[in-house]
Amino acid sequence: MNNNQIQFGGRTLEILDANAGLSGVKFLPSQLSFVTAGYDHTQFLAPLTPGDISKCTSYVTGADKKAVEVFSKFEAYNKQMKETKLAFMSFCTLIVTNPLEDVQFPKLIPETAEEVYLVKNYQERLKKRRQELQENKEIVKHLNIE
């Protein structure tokens, strides 16, 4: 906890990365390796405090070529107030590191209304992500590395 008795954002991201990685392990064929390539739509929506019981949920929402998108959210349950709030959400991109052109991913079968919505909009997010990657390449050209 930080000096305001709120969980450090870095700790939240550490849990997120581990949990998203577990989703990748469950989704991908066992012979494939992957690394975390990036996060987007990352938002801290409400603080996680000492009185909260937090739960991190992650699941795959799309896959294309060598990339797998994983959605993660933190819910915080306040046991005194008996209330649950959405504390954090993010999309994580995992990249398969095996030397393959395209990976044959398992079929995604969304089960809940939330999963159906997020899986349905994957191609839209992928298009935006590819645009952002091009923009980042341009930014990198102008950065000083010492």
Please state what every model-predicted region is.
Residues 18-20, 47, 54:
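Domain-wide signal for the mature, well-folded portions of proteins, strongly enriched
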Residues 49-53, 61-146:
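HotDog/MaoC-like acyl-thioester-processing domains
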